[in-house]
């Protein structure tokens, strides 16, 4: 039996009748430096960075004589190519399979010559470009939902039974997505509507979460597990919306004068997305305005031990992505 039909059968029997992100990307996905202040770059975990160019846009559009490039990493050591670092002979840097420890300040010293046409006098010019590169991941989504049902009274076992049956139906509706209902609660209130007597209504709230038992099996072949869980919980949200939409449809089209005393209140379904960040990551719209919706790796001096969205201060932390304060 369909879930929406099952719920109405229960109601009737109970109550009866009644990527990368940066401020200086160009259309080719390159990021140029800026003299005087660092350019912030955000690289999704396990992905490759954009191409970092050891020049500003103005210099890149001019002839450059005898250029040399020297890249240094977050530890101020000279960078050399390896499995995670690719440096070209034209000064382009790409960071591959990006992880938290790769976050930090990357600097490039560009040296080149200017030559006077009349005298052939050479002058050495040096420019330094800084890039602040941060690992980020998408937040883990869950959804807070609220609905209302009419009831005949705020006392009696029918309200508890409806609450338990509704939770079970909703859990079954989304179980194949490895999502489940958590933190369910309800309160009974009496409501006065214009030109009507008092009504008793159950105000029901719950959260739809993508981490039901067994959810880790989804991540066996994917480094970006939150992409999978977020997709699943979005589908779960859509199923919930459709379920309660059908409740309203049944009420308006399948009942004439007699309706169950306990029934869904039309237009009462409300949904709000909740974002959580994995340990070692957090949100900071002021510091990371170009990646305001991202969970960005916690910088040195901060940490995040849980799924909160804020990196907390800890002066003894000297690494990116700290999950504890020593």
From Swiss-Prot:
Tissue expr: Expressed specifically in male germ cells.
Pfam families given in the database record: EGF_Sp38_C, Sp38
InterPro entries found in the cross-reference section: Sp38-bd (IPR010857), ZPBP1/2_C (IPR048805), ZPBP1/2_N (IPR048806)
Compartment annotation: Cytoplasmic vesicle, Secretory vesicle, Acrosome; Secreted
GO cellular component: acrosomal vesicle; cell body; extracellular region; membrane; zona pellucida receptor complex
Endpoints of the signal sequence: 1-19
Residues with glycosylation annotation: 86, 220, 256
Null mutant phenotype: Male mice are subfertile with sperm showing reduced ability to penetrate zona pellucida and displaying subtle morphological deformation, including shortened apical hook, smaller apical angle and bulges in acrosome region.
GO biological process: acrosome assembly; binding of sperm to zona pellucida; circadian regulation of gene expression; membrane lipid catabolic process; negative regulation of immunoglobulin production; sphingolipid metabolic process
Post-translational modification: N-glycosylated.
Top-level taxonomic group: Eukaryota
UniProt keyword annotations, A-Z: Cytoplasmic vesicle, Glycoprotein, Secreted, Signal
Record's function text: Is implicated in sperm-oocyte interaction during fertilization.
Family, per entry: Belongs to the zona pellucida-binding protein Sp38 family.
Protein name: Zona pellucida-binding protein 2
Name of the encoding gene: Zpbp2
